């Protein structure tokens, strides 16, 4: 019998009614993206890890919703393609610098 691994990061989303998944995602994108950044920071700090899981969990009134996202160390392009534009749009340039540094670290070791 195999035992399921616990997720590395759990993002608990505020309990409330969302119109749909897009509403849930857009409302909570910052917390989800910070979880992704924590995962890539862990990859940087622990070179042995290759895959880490982010669990996004919420209760939407009539439905409990738990979804796991697995991230591979080699898929670091998500930092530039998905995460960075969000923080650029919100003018959080300190976070942009952190993201760029993480991306450059992985680009240089591969």
Language model segments and positions:
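Short, charge-rich, low-complexity alpha-helical interaction segments
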Residues: 19-71
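Hydrophobic/aromatic side-chain positions at a characteristic register within alpha-helices
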Residues: 88-91
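Long, acidic/serine-threonine-rich intrinsically disordered regions with weak helical/coil propensity
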Residues: 1-24
